[in-house]
Amino acid sequence: MDISRKTDYALRMLAMLAEDPECLLSVRTAAEEVNVPYSFARSIQHGLVQAGIVESLRGVHGGMRLKVSPDDVTIRQVVEAVQGPMVMNDCTAPDGDCARMGACCYHPLWAGAQALMRDYLDSVSLGDIVAHRQFPAVDPKFANREAFPEYATCACACREE
């Protein structure tokens, strides 16, 4: 299970939109803010539109904006919109196939880890991120954002062009 750079950039773009839900943000501005090529930002936008997370408005004053409340978008939804289903191992994929299926002692381990990851990312919304709410902690040392001051904020802003 790997959270891709593309997903990281998507989350940063969405945080910019969530900071100001009325904001209409151009893909070009989003690309500049997260420091990615415009074409890459467009492909991210496409996945988010397809998932119903953002809407895209064309034209000179066009751009993208959140289609739903930030509190209604889970981190798992974003991950899966950008990179597809979250799977721990090929055997746990929706169409997973393994020659040892049914006889492998590791399948329950991978399936359990996958379920924990999905449930955890379903428990955190985009709204939680931008509002700096405390995340549910798997381990108490990760519950306190102040333990990670360099990651305390998204440093996101919607700028007018």
Language-model features: locations:
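A short alpha-helical element within helix-turn-helix/winged-helix DNA-binding domains
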Residues: 28-35
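Alpha-helical residues within the helix-turn-helix
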Residues: 32, 49-50
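Short helix-capping/hinge SLiMs at alpha-helix to coil transitions
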Residues: 18-22, 68-69
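Short coil turns linking two alpha-helices in DNA-binding domains
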Residues: 37-40
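Beta-hairpin "wing" of winged helix-turn-helix
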Residues: 52-67
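C-terminal regulatory/oligomerization modules of transcriptional regulators
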Residues: 95-161
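Conserved segment of winged-helix/HTH DNA-binding domains
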Residues: 70-95, 106-116
